[in-house]
């Protein structure tokens, strides 16, 4: 069985490709992660998002600890073939390990001299409640 579709992706020197995760329907950008070949293949096979965790050095099935899995509707490759876009349904409405809907919850306001980052999205569920009793308590 040929998997030439995997070869079309321009993997970086570490065998990874950046992945943008967008919510189907709202079009909110939920998160940014990386995949290796195995993660992309498992995502296609399972219909759920699987990433490569650079900190844990292993595959990471999104939601494996929190239950907040991502059902994949569509996978797109950008024009340079070096970035992937996943369009997903976010189960539980929480994509971020901080308990927020999306990881992009800090907004820059101000100017170059006195600007700062401000939290603009609420915590929907306390991360300690999400990950309570999970081995290692590693927030995704």
UniProtKB/Swiss-Prot annotation:
NCBIfam families, alphabetized: PRK00051.1
Record carries keyword Metal-binding: yes
Residues annotated for Mg(2+) binding in this entry: 78, 80, 82
Record's subcellular location: Cytoplasm
Protein name from the UniProt record: Phosphoribosyl-AMP cyclohydrolase
Originating gene: hisI
Primary location recorded for the protein, binned into one broad class: cytoplasm
HAMAP family: HisI
Keywords recorded for this protein, A-Z: Amino-acid biosynthesis, Cytoplasm, Histidine biosynthesis, Hydrolase, Magnesium, Metal-binding, Zinc
InterPro entries, per database record: PRA-CH, PRib_AMP_CycHydrolase_dom, PRib_AMP_CycHydrolase_sf
